[in-house]
Amino acid sequence: MKSRTGLSILNRILVLTLLFGLVLLGSCEKAPDETPGKGKAVRPARATWTTGFFLEAIYSRALEDLGYTVEDAKNLANPIFYQSLVNDDVDFWANGWFPLHNTQLPKNFDEKAIIAGTIVKAGAIQGYLVDKASVEKYGIKSLDDFKRDEVKKAFDSNGDGKADLVACPPGWGCEKVITHHLKVYDMEAHINPIKAGYTASMADALARYNAKEPVFFYTWTPNWTVNRLAPDKDVMWINVPEINPTEGQKGFEKAMVLKGVAGAVTDPIKMGFPANDISVVANKEFLKKNPAAKRLFEVMSIPLEDIAKQNNRMFAGENSQEEIEQHVTEWIALNKDKWESWLAEARKTAK
């Protein structure tokens, strides 16, 4: 007997059986593994500047949510981290600054490691700031003004005849650039760079500002400093005399002159530092063995303003590892959909 479609009952049974089998196969298709990192350890590192601790914590938390066992982060100076990365002693960090760190990469970096993701695109600016009252009183526009005796005297806190600048500790990328600036702009006899611990030095500068004394410091964004000493309200960005790049800055000269910077003494302003990408940097072999982590690094990013807010909380005293982890938990709760979408992307890659 044939049906109205012309198929025999036997053929209809065969077709239905085939369709049922296809449904079963579809339902048995492997779902993305919720924990592709299960049984695998990750060895993170983090920078020696405390404003980078939040990024390490949030990226490590994401890896934990993928099932990885994340070891305690090693605090490493930039050159030591990059050498450790190519030596396969650590797997990643979320504290890459480029092009600032270009000169600190080992010769075999491209063979062994890679910039694996961008956390903040061209959002990290750096430069020199002076309290607004002094800018107006002395007509300060650039580093060159610190060659004037009355300016040096106002910023000389130890009586050595030089203006004191809160600079960067040895091993930081900015320390090399500041040293370069003082040399090429003939400022070594006029400015004393303070290279002690940055947070403590800036706390001293903040205390001087609150006592209505002049302050002169280097900083970067995101950073708690610009929350406590706000550009245009409390302090002003000043120029370098001319664009004179370090070896690692060559090719980025145009990016060292910025327009529309809030609190700049001029517009445009010669910052002396190009705007940097904050990046995840990882070992290539680690990424090859861990496609879920690789994809996670590619899709994750953190807004600059969120990093700055967290940094401000750290400076206010919430700076223990437990408190930083709590900041991560709170951030995830406020960005749950975005967080889950990143994890879903990573899980799909590992399927």
Can you say where each PLM-predicted feature lies in the sequence?
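C-terminal functional modules
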Residues: 273, 286-287, 294-296, 300-351
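C-terminal motif of bacterial Sec signal peptides marking the signal peptidase cleavage site
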Residues: 24-27
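A bilobed periplasmic-binding-protein/Venus flytrap-type ligand-binding module shared by bacterial periplasmic
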Residues: 126-136, 277-289, 313
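A conserved helix-loop-strand patch within extracytoplasmic ligand-binding domains
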Residues: 113-167
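Short helix-initiation/N-cap motifs at beta->coil->alpha
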Residues: 49-50, 68-83, 193-204, 222-223
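Short, well-ordered beta-strand elements
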Residues: 36-51, 68-74, 162-166, 297
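Flexible, solvent-exposed loop/hinge segments that line or gate ligand/substrate-binding clefts
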Residues: 183-186, 194-308
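Pocket-flanking alpha-helical
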Residues: 56, 76-112, 204, 224-230
